[in-house]
Amino acid sequence: MYGIEYTTFLIYLISIILFNYILKSITRMMDYIIYKFLLIVTIASIVVNAQNYGINLPITGSMDASYVNATKDKPFLTSTLCLYYPTEARTEINDNEWTSTLSQLFLTKGWPTGSVYFKEYDDIATFSVDPQLYCDYNIVLMRYNSSLELDMSELANLILNEWLCNPMDITLYYYQQTDEANKWIAMGQSCTIKVCPLNTQTLGIGCQTTNARTFEEVATAEKLVITDVVDGVNHKLDVTTATCTIRNCKKLGPRENVAVIQVGGADILNITSDPTTAPQTERMMRINWKKWWQVFYTIVDYVNQIVQAMSKMSGSLNSAAFYYRV
C-alpha cells in the first residue's frame, strides 16, 4: 500500500516538474518571438522612415498650436483681441499714449482694459515671414498698395485659412499636388521657386531634371510664396533652401478667429486661386480712410460687429510650427 502511495506521489512530482519545464520552454519561445518581432519592427521603421521616390504621403503636420477652447456666452468679457498694424500707423499718429487712448475707447464697447493687445509689424513682406496670431480674435490691418497687391493676397490666404503641412525633401524626391486644396507654401528671407513638370517616364516636360536652369520660375526672391501647379502631375523643384523653407500643405478650411481689414483700395482683394470664381469672405473687409486715427476709430466703432463675423477657436497660428513641426 505504501508502495502505491509513493508511486502516486512520484507521478505527481514528475508531472509537476515536467509541466514546469514545458511552461518555461514556452515562455522562452514566446520571449524569443516577441524580441525578434520587435527587432524586425525597429529595423523596418528605420528603413522606411523616408518617402519613396515620387510617392505622396498623407499630410499630417500642423501650423497650429493648440489651446484650451474657452468659448463663453459673452465672449467680449472673457476673450482677448489682437490688433495688428503696420509701423507706419504709429509713425503717423506720433503719440506715445495712443494705445492707451484706444484701450479706453474699446472699454466703451465692452472690451475690458487689458483684453486688447496692439501688435506692430514693419511691413507686409516682413509680417509674411513670421505671422503669429495668438489671441482669441485677431484683426490684421493692411494698408493697400498696388505694387504689393499679390503679396497682400497671399498673406491673407495664409492667415485666413487653416493648413496642415509636411516637410519637402526636394533634393531627393519629386512631388505632385493632388487637388485644389493642396499647395506648396514657402517662407523665408528670399524664396525663389522653380519647377519642372514630369511625364509618366519621369522625364522633364520642357525642362531637364538635371539642369535647374531649364526649370520654370514661379517665384523670385519673395518672402512668402503659395505655389499652385497642375494637379496630378509630378514635379521636380528647385528652391533657395539656404534662405527659404518650403512645405507641402493642405488647406483644411477657414481660420475663423482671424479677420483682415484692407485700408484703402477700390475693391477688396480676392484671395482665391480659382480663376472661375471670385468668392468673398465675411472676414475680409475694407476701410477707406487716409488717416490712421480714422481707421482705428472705425475699428473701435465696429469691433463687435467684426467679431460677430468671426468664431473663437482653440488654435493659434504659429509660424514656428511651419519650420519645425513634422
Swiss-Prot record:
Keywords from the named record? Calcium, Capsid protein, Disulfide bond, Glycoprotein, Host endoplasmic reticulum, Host-virus interaction, Metal-binding, Outer capsid protein, Signal, T=13 icosahedral capsid protein, Virion
Source domain of life: Viruses
Q: Where is the signal peptide?
A: 1-50
Region (GPR motif): which ranges? 253-255
Q: What is its main location?
A: virion
Binding positions (Ca(2+) 2)? 177, 228-229, 231, 301
Positions bound to Ca(2+) 1: 95, 206, 214, 216
Q: Where in the cell is it found?
A: Virion; Host endoplasmic reticulum lumen
| Cited Pfam families | VP7
Which residues have a glycan attached per UniProt?
69, 145, 270
Q: Where is the region LVD motif?
A: 237-239
Calcium: is it a keyword of this entry? Answer: yes
- Disulfide bond entries: 82-135, 165-249, 191-244, 196-207
Q: Where is this region: CNP motif?
A: 165-167
Q: How is it modified after translation?
A: N-glycosylated.
Give me the Gene Ontology terms describing cellular component: host cell endoplasmic reticulum lumen; T=13 icosahedral viral capsid; viral outer capsid
Q: Which InterPro entries match?
A: VP7 (IPR001963), VP7_1 (IPR042207), VP7_2 (IPR042210)
Tagged with keyword Repeat: no
Q: Which family does it belong to?
A: Belongs to the rotavirus VP7 family.
Function comment: Calcium-binding protein that interacts with rotavirus cell receptors once the initial attachment by VP4 has been achieved. Rotavirus attachment and entry into the host cell probably involves multiple sequential contacts between the outer capsid proteins VP4 and VP7, and the cell receptors. Following entry into the host cell, low intracellular or intravesicular Ca(2+) concentration probably causes the calcium-stabilized VP7 trimers to dissociate from the virion. This step is probably necessary for the membrane-disrupting entry step and the release of VP4, which is locked onto the virion by VP7.
Q: What is its quaternary makeup?
A: Homotrimer; disulfide-linked. 2 Ca(2+) ions bound at each subunit interface in the trimer hold the trimer together. Interacts with the intermediate capsid protein VP6. Interacts with the outer capsid protein VP5*.
Further notes on this entry? Some rotavirus strains are neuraminidase-sensitive and require sialic acid to attach to the cell surface. Some rotavirus strains are integrin-dependent. Some rotavirus strains depend on ganglioside for their entry into the host cell. Hsp70 also seems to be involved in the entry of some strains. In group A rotaviruses, VP7 defines the G serotype.
This protein is called Outer capsid glycoprotein VP7
| Native organism taxonomy | Viruses, Riboviria, Orthornavirae, Duplornaviricota, Resentoviricetes
